[in-house]
């Protein structure tokens, strides 16, 4: 079984977000303002499931919940 790539429970860095977007095909970095940005989780139809700004106090905790349940790994997306 492949280990999940998750975020820290609070705010997260661009490097941490990029690790997630590289691992999951349905999670993207959006509204990039340079120092801050949103990470967005979408379902298989492309509809937004959850999003959070990287600086929010509980950003990672909320996103991790949806990464676990809705994240589509890039290594399985082509199977």
From Swiss-Prot:
Return the SUPFAM superfamilies for the record: YcfA/nrd intein domain
Classification via InterPro entries: DUF905, YkfF-like_sf
Pfam families the UniProt entry points to = DUF905
Family, according to the entry, reads as follows:
Belongs to the UPF0401 family.
What is the protein named? Answer: UPF0401 protein YkfF
The organism is: Escherichia coli (strain K12)
């Amino acid at each position: 079984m492949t280990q999940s790539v998750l975020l820290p429970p609070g705010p997260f860095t661009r490097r941490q977000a990029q690790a997630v977007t590289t691992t999951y095909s349905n999670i993207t970095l959006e509204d990039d303002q340079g120092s801050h940005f949103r990470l967005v989780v979408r379902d298989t139809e492309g509809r937004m499931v959850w999003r959070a700004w990287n600086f929010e106090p509980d950003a990672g905790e909320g996103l991790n919940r949806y990464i676990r349940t809705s994240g589509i790994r890039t290594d399985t997306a082509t199977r």
